[in-house]
């Protein structure tokens, strides 16, 4: 299961680099883009929002079919959007090698419990073929449709509001919009959307304190590792508490990546975007969950 998750993430990362590169080099973008960056072409943001919506549907389908945990398209939408939104893309060879090394390291860490003794051993083996619980078509079609629709609507709303409200990270709204879709039943799905907003607000305070400290590079990396560990400790027990640490983890990771890409980092703008787009996306996701529920209630 871990290997399958790594394979899907690897494909997602390469897809993000390919999509950003293709948009930057497309004939429509030539002559309008400065230094080959995607952000200078107005239609690029709309195109990328559409691609991310498709990624949400495809990865939700694959995670359901392979029974990956945690389910849903959340992490893959985040990875795709974060990589594709970078002002410059790394050489493809460098990206491939780095991704493979990190995935192998993660797999090794996952199997490190074997060092504690035989009682922690679990036989190696390729997992059974993927399955859908229940009728395949009845599961697959609504799953893909809801994820694509939710991410598309959230992306559209964020883009339409980007100029008057000054927000610049559309994929954060799309990310928040798919969170409720991983919950079941409807009450749990709505709770996940609300919990994300509440937890994100608290996490923004922690992220602001971390950014105000202006940590050096080595300290920034340690903070990211710390928040990652804290997230893993609490996310299963409490989604709200998990968001307290996921939010600074995500923002500091973006800050680190932008520094590596040579871009200017405005911590205040990142905090503003994260908070506002989380509210937009969560609202869209909750409505997406409630609409089928309302239709079922009326049809009874």
Regions found by a protein language model. Name each.
Residues 1-76, 80-244, 248, 253-300:
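Alpha-helical transmembrane segments and their membrane-interface boundaries
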